[in-house]
């Protein structure tokens, strides 16, 4: 446990920030997995496109705000785009 008042405050701040970061990353994981499930179940193209767009928007937002590294966001977007393109071609 922290011995100083400022250290206690830093601990509280880091716990809040850690929880916020975890929740945002979890939202992203859910969006990506939802899109992949939709593709696996051969859902309608329009539904998959909406899921794709929301996942890409979330990736952009998290990358710009440094919740995840910008390169990781770019790599994930590329993977999702390839997955989406292969799904569209298959139909």
UniProtKB/Swiss-Prot annotation:
InterPro entries xref list: Ribosomal_bS20, Ribosomal_bS20_sf
Keywords from the named record: Ribonucleoprotein, Ribosomal protein, RNA-binding, rRNA-binding
Tree of life domain: Bacteria
Name of a matching Pfam family: Ribosomal_S20p
GO MF entries: small ribosomal subunit rRNA binding; structural constituent of ribosome
Compositional bias per record (Basic and acidic residues), positions renumbered to this chain: 1-18
One GO location term (cellular component): small ribosomal subunit
Positions of the UniProt region annotated as Disordered: 1-26
GO terms (BP aspect): translation
Function comment: Binds directly to 16S ribosomal RNA.
Family: Belongs to the bacterial ribosomal protein bS20 family.
PANTHER family for the chain: 30S RIBOSOMAL PROTEIN S20 (PTHR33398), SMALL RIBOSOMAL SUBUNIT PROTEIN BS20C (PTHR33398:SF1)
Protein name as annotated: Small ribosomal subunit protein bS20
Native organism: Pelodictyon phaeoclathratiforme (strain DSM 5477 / BU-1)
Lineage: Bacteria, Pseudomonadati, Chlorobiota, Chlorobiia, Chlorobiales
